[in-house]
């Protein structure tokens, strides 16, 4: 395709003196080695120009090599058995203790991205083991042949255009991820540029593309976020559909409740249009009036009881008016009974006076009278 070329690094041979060198390789992050001479043909001239530009390794590669070579840090980072790869054994401690000393940051993800820009690749997925054909134990001179890849401006423009097209085509508006263009300095620059962890995914992925063979073979890598945007739009569309169903269900429930309450309060339905907008309906006015009447009656009853208690006499704080009235009634009833008995006794006395006395009673009465007379003498 135009703007994208893949393939292995061509081997360049030239006539004259020269040495072995390495150049950054294909799209998978591998690198290949080729021979270049200082004179001779056109290929030799190109190789000589590359050696002049790659005479000094970048500080990032130098510091990384020193970390791997130092036996003091073997518990955190070290070579493998044959010295072709290096392994970060404890990423957390490595980022906390060593990265601030050498790279002025403590972000392990940034360190890994920086390795990717120099063509390092991860060997196994379950371990932080990285390899590069020009990064080997005892061959520090090969570091100058590791090229740092550049970010192509057309690739960034294509990524931005694809993201904009995906957003425009989607039905749901999604905030697009900003695309930040990082201008990477050439490999012989002394300033290290570490990609920040806040960089966009498009910019971080675009950093994989680069220049191969000192500019002779250029590869453009474009990484769009269109699939991610489509997936996000699909998820948001499903969420909107779910919320719409819930809203419809709640509206139906509200309508049923309103109808049920309207059946119990028929007057409210006629007066609904008279209520100001936003004012809630008073669905239970009768209950409120009833409660107010009950409260008023309780207050009046309490006042009456209080007044009655104030009018009755008390003994040691206890009302005795009711008991006194009961005693008066009992006394009145007893007096009436006594009166009845007296009347009955008087009637019996009158009846006994009319009865004729017996002779013995007369004699006895005479004797008694005589005795009384004798005593009187």
UniProtKB/Swiss-Prot annotation:
The keyword DNA-binding applies. Its main location: nucleus. It comes from Arabidopsis thaliana. GO terms for biological process: cellular response to hypoxia; negative regulation of DNA-templated transcription. Residues 220-265 are annotated as: Hydrophobic repeat HR-A/B. This is Heat stress transcription factor B-2b. It is found in: Nucleus. SMART domains: HSF. It comes from the Eukaryota. The gene is HSFB2B. Residues 14-51 have a biased composition (Gly residues). One of its GO terms (molecular function) is DNA-binding transcription factor activity. Transcriptional regulator that specifically binds DNA sequence 5'-AGAAnnTTCT-3' known as heat shock promoter elements (HSE). The hydrophobic-rich region (HR-A/B) corresponds to the oligomerization domain.
């Amino acid at each position: 395709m135009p703007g994208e070329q893949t393939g292995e690094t061509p081997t360049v041979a030239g006539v004259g003196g020269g040495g072995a060198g390495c150049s950054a390789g294909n799209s998978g992050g591998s690198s290949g080695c080729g021979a270049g001479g200082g004179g001779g043909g056109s290929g030799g001239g190109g190789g000589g120009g590359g050696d002049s530009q790659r005479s000094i390794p970048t500080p990032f590669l130098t510091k990384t090599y020193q970390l791997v070579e130092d036996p003091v840090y073997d518990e955190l980072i070290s070579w493998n058995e044959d010295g072709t790869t290096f392994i970060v054994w404890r990423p957390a401690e490595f980022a906390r203790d060593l990265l601030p000393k050498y790279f002025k940051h403590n972000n392990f993800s940034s360190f890994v991205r920086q390795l990717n820009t120099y063509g390092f690749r991860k060997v196994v997925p379950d371990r932080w083991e990285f390899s590069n054909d020009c990064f080997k134990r005892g061959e520090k001179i090969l570091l100058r042949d590791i090229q740092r890849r550049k970010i192509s401006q057309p690739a960034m423009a294509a990524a931005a255009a694809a993201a904009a097209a995906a957003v425009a085509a989607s039905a749901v508006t999604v905030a697009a991820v900003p695309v930040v263009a990082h201008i990477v300095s050439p490999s012989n620059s002394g300033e290290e540029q570490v990609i920040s962890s806040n960089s966009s995914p498009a910019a971080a992925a675009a950093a994989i593309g680069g220049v191969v063979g000192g500019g002779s073979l250029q590869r453009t890598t474009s990484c769009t976020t269109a699939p991610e945007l489509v997936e996000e739009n699909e998820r948001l569309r499903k969420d909107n559909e779910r919320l719409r169903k819930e809203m419809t269900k709640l509206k139906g429930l509200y309508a049923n409740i309103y109808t049920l309450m309207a059946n119990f309060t028929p007057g409210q339905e006629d007066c609904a249009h008279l209520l100001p907008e936003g004012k809630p309906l008073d669905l239970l006015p009768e209950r409120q009036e009833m409660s107010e009447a009950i409260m008023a009656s309780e207050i009046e009853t309490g006042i009456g009881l209080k007044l009655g208690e104030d009018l009755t006499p008390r003994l040691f704080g206890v009302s005795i008016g009711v008991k006194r009235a009961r005693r008066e009634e009992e006394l009145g009833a007893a007096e009436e009974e006594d009166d009845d008995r007296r009347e009955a006794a008087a009637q019996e006395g009158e009846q006994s006076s009319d009865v004729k006395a017996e002779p013995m009673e007369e004699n006895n009465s005479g004797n008694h009278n005589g005795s009384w007379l004798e005593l009187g003498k």
